[in-house]
């Protein structure tokens, strides 16, 4: 199914039914008094989060969603039937905003979370309500109220603990397939990844985290170049960013330091809060660098890049250094997360959008040195 992470829809709640101005008419009861019933309430529009859905594609084409109107009241004190509510199912992680006011209506972060987005109109009152000691035969009644009508902007932001950054062909998809059971498309050409890939990484019983790979960024992404700018929003919920760098590009004219600086620049231009997130440097494809050159090449990169944070040396293809990185990530998340992060990871592990997998060889990852 095609991945769609943004849509605009109109939701229209039902109008309330009108009240009835009816008089009781029965044989031998010439002055029966008022018996007009109330109108039924209009149907409301709700959204509910469903972890079995992973795209907003249903709302890319079905743009108008209407609930039924309430029925009018009738005589003999008959109340109108209320309009049926409608429920729109959306992926967990969907953010809903009112397009006219900019109001944040809902942030669907939990499975089965239900939110009212358009309230049905109240039913009108029948003339029975207007009877008094001085007005025994009232003719007044009220009309039903109109239901709410809203234009909504839907944005899907995936729920992940860790996000991967990097140029196209930095090895992000290979890395996520190496440490989890996600199966992204992998090839030796740019923009192989066209939509976010997610995987649950298990490091032991009850120890897991969710990792997200988005399409690679290129210079100018913040202004719309390439593909990655469309998906940077998916990194906004993460607690840690991994900046993957190809330390052995096929094209010798490519400078990894210049590419790394471009990524950081695009991140800052797109969202300052993303730039401020904790970020680790992961130097990938070291299996392509001769052993006697590795230390010097790593040191040269770190010096020219001016990096002072955590650095990991890995080969996503062979798995070298990946286990140590996985354990370091888990330890960091446990130390810096709130109390319910582990519970959230377990909930996400059961989500069909995420592939739950043990470590390499079917066993939990064993610790491996790799951080500087």
From Swiss-Prot:
GO terms for biological process: ribosome biogenesis. GO terms for cellular component: cytoplasm. The keyword Lyase does not apply. Residues 160-334 form the OBG-type G domain. InterPro entries: G_OBG, GTP-bd, GTP-bd_Obg/CgtA, GTP1-OBG_CS, GTP1_OBG_dom, GTP1_OBG_dom_sf, OBG_GTPase, P-loop_NTPase. Mg(2+) binds at residues 173, 193. Keywords: Cytoplasm, GTP-binding, Hydrolase, Magnesium, Metal-binding, Nucleotide-binding. GTP binds at residues 166-173, 191-195, 213-216, 284-287, 315-317. SUPFAM superfamilies: Obg GTP-binding protein N-terminal domain, P-loop containing nucleoside triphosphate hydrolases. GO terms for molecular function: GTP binding; GTPase activity; magnesium ion binding. Residues 128-147 are annotated as: Disordered. An essential GTPase which binds GTP, GDP and possibly (p)ppGpp with moderate affinity, with high nucleotide exchange rates and a fairly low GTP hydrolysis rate. Plays a role in control of the cell cycle, stress response, ribosome biogenesis and in those bacteria that undergo differentiation, in morphogenesis control. Monomer. Belongs to the TRAFAC class OBG-HflX-like GTPase superfamily. OBG GTPase family. This is GTPase Obg. It comes from Burkholderia mallei (strain ATCC 23344). The gene is obg.
């Amino acid at each position: 199914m095609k991945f769609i992470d943004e849509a605009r829809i109109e939701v229209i709640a039902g109008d309330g039914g009108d009240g009835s101005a009816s008089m009781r008419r029965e044989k031998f009861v010439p002055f029966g008094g008022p018996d007009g019933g109330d109108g039924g309430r209009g149907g409301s529009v709700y959204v509910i989060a469903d972890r079995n859905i992973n795209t907003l594609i249903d709302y890319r084409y079905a743009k108008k969603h209407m609930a039924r109107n309430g029925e009018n009241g009738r005589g003999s004190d008959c109340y109108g039937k209320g309009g049926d509510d409608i429920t729109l199912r959306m992926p967990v992680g969907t953010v809903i905003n009112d397009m006219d006011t900019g109001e944040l209506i809902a942030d669907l972060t939990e499975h089965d979370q239900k939110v009212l987005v358009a309230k049905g109109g109240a039913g009108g009152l029948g003339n029975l309500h207007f009877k008094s000691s001085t007005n025994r035969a009232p003719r007044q009644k009220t009309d039903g109220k109109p239901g709410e009508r809203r234009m909504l902007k839907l944005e899907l932001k995936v729920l992940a603990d860790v996000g991967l950054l990097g140029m196209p062909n930095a090895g992000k998809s290979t890395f996520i397939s190496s440490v989890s059971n996600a199966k992204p498309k992998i090839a030796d050409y740019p923009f192989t990844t066209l939509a976010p890939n997610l995987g649950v990484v298990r490091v032991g019983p009850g120890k897991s985290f969710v990792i997200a790979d988005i399409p690679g960024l290129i210079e100018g992404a913040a202004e719309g170049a390439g593909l990655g700018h469309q998906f940077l929003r998916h990194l906004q919920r993460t607690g840690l960013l991994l900046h993957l760098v190809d330390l052995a590009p096929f094209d010798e004219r490519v400078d990894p330091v210049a590419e790394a600086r471009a990524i950081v620049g695009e991140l800052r231009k797109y969202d300052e809060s993303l730039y401020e997130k904790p970020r680790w440097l992961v130097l990938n494809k070291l299996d392509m660098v001769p052993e006697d050159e590795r230390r010097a090449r790593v040191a040269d990169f770190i010096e020219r890049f001016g990096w002072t944070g955590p650095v990991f040396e890995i080969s996503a293809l062979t798995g070298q250094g990946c286990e140590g990185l996985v354990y370091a990530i888990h330890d960091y998340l446990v130390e810096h997360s709130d109390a319910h992060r582990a519970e959230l990871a377990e909930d996400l592990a059961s989500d069909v959008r995420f592939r739950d997998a043990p470590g390499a060889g079917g066993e939990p990852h064993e610790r491996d040195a790799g951080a500087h």
